[in-house]
């Protein structure tokens, strides 16, 4: 069993999603958004750090998964996003959580099957995969999708390791 915290970073709204993985079964534990309503960036970063730390304390995840920075057309926005990601990652590292990063395209490919999927498609698939009564809000759905991606990637890595181990055992006999 593992609890995974997914984070969809932003400088004003940070989505989070928490799921439990038992074997191949995924279950929803919680999701939402950290909203920073102050204008100055240092205060927003402080709120992000405090919010992520609070979520970690509440859910006690085993793994922390976050979306990688994409290259935005606006350099200022990309820098602010990078700082928000950094603060969230520091919150995880301070709690000694292993951090995993996934590209947005990989998350969409894993959850929807199309790397260029729309937000509404991600919301629908997250709802379906986690058996939720309604679509989660967009940023929370993205965070849940990041957590789901981590489960799939780690599951595949474990299967590959087992296959290699079985091959090695076969050669040793």
Curated annotation (Swiss-Prot):
Binds 2 Mg(2+) ion per subunit. It catalyses: Endonucleolytic cleavage at a junction such as a reciprocal single-stranded crossover between two homologous DNA duplexes (Holliday junction). The active site is at 8, 67, 139. SUPFAM superfamilies: Ribonuclease H-like. Keywords: Cytoplasm, DNA damage, DNA recombination, DNA repair, DNA-binding, Endonuclease, Hydrolase, Magnesium, Metal-binding, Nuclease. GO terms for biological process: DNA recombination; DNA repair. Its EC number is 3.1.21.10. Its main location: cytoplasm. Mg(2+) 2 binds at residue 67. Disulfide bonds: none annotated. GO terms for cellular component: cytoplasm; Holliday junction resolvase complex. It is found in: Cytoplasm. GO terms for molecular function: crossover junction DNA endonuclease activity; DNA binding; magnesium ion binding. Mg(2+) 1 binds at residues 8, 139. PROSITE patterns: RUVC. Its cofactor is Mg(2+). Belongs to the RuvC family. Homodimer which binds Holliday junction (HJ) DNA. The HJ becomes 2-fold symmetrical on binding to RuvC with unstacked arms; it has a different conformation from HJ DNA in complex with RuvA. In the full resolvosome a probable DNA-RuvA(4)-RuvB(12)-RuvC(2) complex forms which resolves the HJ. The RuvA-RuvB-RuvC complex processes Holliday junction (HJ) DNA during genetic recombination and DNA repair. Endonuclease that resolves HJ intermediates. Cleaves cruciform DNA by making single-stranded nicks across the HJ at symmetrical positions within the homologous arms, yielding a 5'-phosphate and a 3'-hydroxyl group; requires a central core of homology in the junction. The consensus cleavage sequence is 5'-(A/T)TT(C/G)-3'. Cleavage occurs on the 3'-side of the TT dinucleotide at the point of strand exchange. This is Crossover junction endodeoxyribonuclease RuvC. The gene is ruvC.
């Amino acid at each position: 069993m593992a609890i995974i915290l997914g984070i969809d970073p932003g400088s004003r709204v940070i989505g989070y999603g928490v799921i439990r993985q038992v074997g191949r079964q995924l279950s929803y534990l919680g999701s939402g958004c950290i909203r920073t309503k102050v204008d100055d960036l240092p205060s927003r970063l402080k709120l992000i750090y405090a919010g992520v730390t609070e979520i970690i304390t509440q859910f006690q995840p085993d793994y922390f998964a976050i979306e990688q920075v994409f290259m935005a057309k606006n350099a200022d926005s990309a820098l602010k996003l990078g700082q928000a990601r950094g603060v969230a990652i520091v919150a995880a590292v301070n709690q000694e959580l292993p951090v995993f990063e996934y590209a947005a395209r990989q998350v969409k490919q894993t959850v929807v099957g199309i790397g260029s999927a729309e937000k509404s498609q991600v919301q629908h698939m997250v709802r379906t995969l986690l058996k939720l009564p309604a679509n989660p809000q967009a940023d929370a759905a993205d965070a849940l999708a990041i957590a789901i991606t981590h489960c799939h990637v780690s599951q595949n890595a474990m299967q590959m390791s087992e296959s290699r181990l079985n091959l090695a055992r076969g050669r040793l006999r």
